[in-house]
Structure formats: structure tokens, C-alpha cells
From Swiss-Prot:
Residues 439-475 are annotated as: Disordered. Residues 165-250 form the PPIase FKBP-type domain. Belongs to the FKBP-type PPIase family. Tig subfamily. The keyword 4Fe-4S does not apply. Consists of 3 domains; the N-terminus binds the ribosome, the middle domain has PPIase activity, while the C-terminus has intrinsic chaperone activity on its own. The keyword Transport does not apply. Residues 439-466 have a biased composition (Basic and acidic residues). Keywords: Cell cycle, Cell division, Chaperone, Cytoplasm, Isomerase, Rotamase. One of its GO terms (molecular function) is peptidyl-prolyl cis-trans isomerase activity. This is Trigger factor. The gene is tig. GO terms for biological process: 'de novo' cotranslational protein folding; cell division; chaperone-mediated protein folding; protein transport; protein unfolding. One of its GO terms (cellular component) is cytoplasm.
């Protein structure tokens, strides 16, 4: 096998491989000889089939197998001999010729690929980060405990008009220009006035109603509403009030805690505190991680593989356009041209790829590994995020090993960050919750999870639709 480098520019490589016809002929003869004693053909005694007859019957199929074996094995061995790590799977171009299958021509093919850049890892001691730590006010815990226990609150039927805080039972039918729309109807819907469960203007118009009332209200869907066909549109809802309930006094005690599955109020407060600490701790870590990545970004500047950059940019660009589409907005609405947005996200893609390569190199150098238990935990966390679909999600991961492997990269990255935190200077700083939550320029485009379909009148509670919410009843 003759191996010739035909291109070596930057990270790009092209290798020409020629397997002489005589080498192919030798491999074919070996396979035919091996088959001769095993094949059973009518008219011939075992082991007595003439070579010419075997070649006529099996020659081309055997040669095709030989060529496939070469294509499978050669790239790996060539890259190993050259001590190169390809950024992506090499592209193989084959010189197709019928004579090759007949063993009368050399087998020529080429490899085209980009190599990963050689990265010299620098010292980390100069990196300094501020770790913001916020004490959790007791009032935050009190408020969250009240929210958790609000689901245990009892309501009593009332005769008078509804007030904010009351619960009403209603039937409703939504219409656009007089025509009912999908997801815009429900029967026996329970709505607590003032909960902001529905879109702005809906609940407010139900203050003052009584059981038996029928009314039509007009509302406008928010411009950034998740359902694009409803965003910014005026709608009317025909509403029938079936009952009005006043809230009973909310009891904050051990008995209430037991109703939500905990043995005591103290245990509930402990769980709530842990959840809030986890939430703020995650925010603290993200800010620290951002500082580390900024420092690494300033320390490293090297050529990156165009193939990786193209994939990263396309992923970002697809998500950006999907987000705009869901919000019913355009680049002009965001105050930027599409061309300018492309430039900005191209820079972001470069940063992501470069930092990914740096973190990967650091991890390999210091021996960071992701074990099977960590992968299993990541799978279970994914499953947990889709209540009611646990079996389907678990089956997906069982049948799709590459999906499990995709969870390895973020775990690996976080373990590298853990390593770096032990090497750099970290200064803790006490801050208020408001200071901790203060927004800063995002480096990464947030990951979005697929969302289940929801009722058209339910207000979107966050910038990203949660996949955990249950689907609404259909009209």
C-alpha cells in the first residue's frame, strides 16, 4: 500500500492511498484458497472445485469485501502512523473502476480531513475568579413553603361575587374573529383569580362574577406568546361561571406538610432550603464558570477546524431562528440585521469550539474520566424531566447509545471545571440575592428542551417553555 500526502495546509490534510493490483490479487487468491476446501457445489467433490470456477462465482463479491476491509482499516492505521487526531471522520473519495473488482487495476482512494490543533496547555495560577455567595433570607423560605402548601388550601363555596384570591369554576370557548381555535376551550376549569395562570387580562375580567353568570371577554395574546399563530392577536372568550369559592385560612403546620408527602413542617422547610440553595448554587457556579471560560478564551488563540466551526455555527443558527419563530419575531424586531447577527453568532461559535478543544485537552492531560455511574445518573436526570413519559424516554436511551454518549461531554466539561477550580485563585464574596441574580451578558445560547403542547390561554411562565408541564385537556 502506497501512502502519499497530497495536501498539508494549516489543519487540512489530504492523503492518497494506492493498493497495487498485485496485492489485491494476493488477498483474493488467499480468500479463494480458504474457500476452496469449505464450499459445496453440485457436480464437484469437496475440495475439488477448480480455482477458475470459484473465481468466476465468488471473485467480485470477495474483492468487494476486501476493498471494504481496506477502507475500514486503512484510515485508522494511517492516522496512527502519522500520529494525527482527526477533528471529524475523514472523508473518503474512491476511484471507482470495474477493473478493480476484476483484480486488473490498482485500488486508489483518498482521505480528506482536518487534524485537531496541537494545544500547549498553559499554567492556571494567574486565573482569579470571584465566587458570589448569597445567604438565603428566611422570608424566601417562608414564601416558598407557603407556595408549596397552597396546594393543600381548602376552598368553601360562596354566594357573592368573586374577588382576587377566590377560585372560580368555569367553562370557556376562545375565538379568533368569531372562529373557535385549537386549545382555546375547556370545561370545569379551576382558576384562582390573581394567580396569573392565564394570559394577561383574562383573570382580571372575572373579578366580580357570580355563579351562573355568562359573559364574553376580550384579551390580546402577548406578542412573544409561544404559539406563533396566536401571538399578538385579539381573541374573545365566551365564559360560563359555574361556581365561586372563597379560600379558607392556609394552615402552616405538620399536618399540612404531611399532605405534600413530608413528615413535618421542619422537614418541609429543610427540603425547601435545600432546593433554594441548589438553585442559587447553580447560579453561583455558572458565574464562576463564565469567568474561567473568559480567562481561558483570553489565554488561547489558535486555528480551529473549519468542519467543527461549521457544525457549531449551524447548530446555534438553527436554534436562534427557531427561538425567533416561536416568539413570532424577526431580527429587525431585535434591532439587528440578519447579516450582523450571523457575524456575532459566528464569533460565538468560534469561542465555543476553541474553548471546547482547550477543555478537552486539559481533561485528557490530567486524566479526567466519565464513569458509567455518572452516565447512568445523567440518563435518569433526563428521564426525570419528562414526567409521564419516563418509559418512552428510557427506551429511547436504551435504543440510542449515541444519545447516552452525548451526555458524556457536559459531564466531562464540568469535571474539568472542578479540576480548574482547585488550581486557580477563588475569592468568595458575600452578596445579596439581587446581586447574585443580576444579569450579565450570556456567552452560550441556552439549551431548549422540547415542550409538550399546552392550552392556548395558559400564560408562558418563563422564556423557555417547560417540558415538565402537563398537556391541557382538549376541547
Amino acid at each position: 500500500m502506497q501512502v502519499t500526502e497530497t495536501l498539508n495546509e494549516g489543519l487540512k490534510r489530504e492523503i492518497k492511498i494506492v493498493v497495487p493490483a498485485k496485492d489485491l490479487e494476493e488477498k483474493l487468491n488467499e480468500r479463494l484458497d480458504d474457500t476452496k476446501g469449505k464450499v459445496r457445489l453440485n457436480g464437484f467433490r469437496p475440495g475439488k472445485v477448480p480455482g477458475g470456477h470459484l473465481r468466476k462465482m465468488y471473485g467480485k463479491s470477495f474483492m468487494a469485501e476486501i476493498l471494504n476491509e481496506i477502507l475500514n482499516d486503512a484510515p485508522r492505521s494511517i492516522l496512527a502512523d502519522r500520529n494525527e487526531r482527526p477533528a471529524m471522520q475523514p472523508k473518503i473519495d474512491i476511484d471507482e473502476d470495474e477493473k478493480i473488482l476484476d483484480g486488473k487495476a490498482d485500488f486508489t482512494f483518498s482521505l480528506k480531513y482536518e487534524v485537531l490543533p496541537k494545544i500547549e496547555i498553559k499554567a492556571f495560577e494567574h486565573i482569579e475568579v470571584i465566587r458570589e455567595i448569597a445567604a438565603i433570607p428566611e422570608k424566601d423560605i417562608d414564601e416558598q413553603v407557603n407556595r408549596v402548601l397552597s396546594s393543600t388550601r381548602n376552598y368553601s363555596l360562596k354566594e357573592g361575587s368573586s374577588e382576587e384570591g377566590d377560585r372560580v369554576t368555569i367553562d370557556y370557548l376562545g375565538k379568533l374573529e368569531g372562529v373557535p381555535f385549537e386549545g382555546g376551550a375547556d370545561n370545569d376549569a379551576q382558576l384562582i383569580l390573581g394567580s396569573k395562570q392565564f394570559i394577561p387580562g383574562f383573570e382580571e375580567q372575572l373579578v366580580g362574577v357570580k355563579a351562573g353568570d355568562a359573559k364574553t371577554i376580550s384579551v390580546k395574546f402577548p406578542d412573544n406568546y409561544s404559539a406563533v399563530h396566536l401571538a399578538g392577536r385579539e381573541a374573545e372568550f365566551d365564559i360560563t361561571v359555574k361556581a365561586v369559592f372563597r379560600p379558607d385560612e392556609l394552615k402552616i403546620d405538620d399536618e399540612a406538610a404531611k399532605k405534600v408527602g413530608l413528615e413535618s413542617l421542619d422537614r418541609l422547610r429543610e427540603v425547601v432550603r435545600g432546593q433554594i440553595e441548589s438553585q442559587y448554587g447553580s447560579m453561583t457556579r455558572q458565574k464562576v464558570k463564565r469567568q474561567i471560560l473568559d480567562a481561558l478564551d483570553a489565554d488561547y488563540n489558535f486555528e480551529i477546524p473549519e468542519g467543527l466551526l461549521e457544525i457549531e455555527f449551524n447548530n446555534i443558527w438553527a436554534q436562534v431562528n427557531d427561538d425567533l419563530k416561536k416568539a413570532g419575531r424577526s431580527f429587525e424586531d431585535e434591532g439587528v440585521t440578519e447579516e450582523k447577527a450571523r457575524e456575532e453568532y459566528h464569533v460565538l461559535a468560534q469561542r465555543r469550539v476553541r474553548l471546547g478543544l482547550v477543555l478537552s485537552e486539559i481533561g485528557m492531560k490530567v486524566g479526567v474520566k466519565v464513569n458509567e455511574d455518572e452516565l447512568k445518573a445523567a440518563v435518569f436526570e433526563q428521564v426525570r424531566q419528562y414526567p409521564g413519559q419516563e418509559k418512552e424516554i428510557m427506551d429511547f436511551f436504551r435504543k440510542t447509545p449515541e444519545a447516552v454518549e452525548n451526555l458524556r461531554a457536559p459531564i466531562f466539561e464540568e469535571k474539568v471545571i472542578d479540576y480548574l477550580l482547585a488550581q486557580i485563585k477563588v475569592t468568595d464574596k458575600e452578596v445579596t440575592i439581587e446581586e447574585l441574580m443580576k444579569e450579565y451578558d450570556e456567552t452560550d445560547v441556552p439549551e431548549e428542551k422540547p415542550a409538550k403542547k399546552k392550552s392556548a390561554v395558559k400564560e408562558k411562565s418563563a422564556e423557555k417553555t417547560s417540558a415538565k408541564k402537563k398537556a391541557p385537556k382538549k376541547a
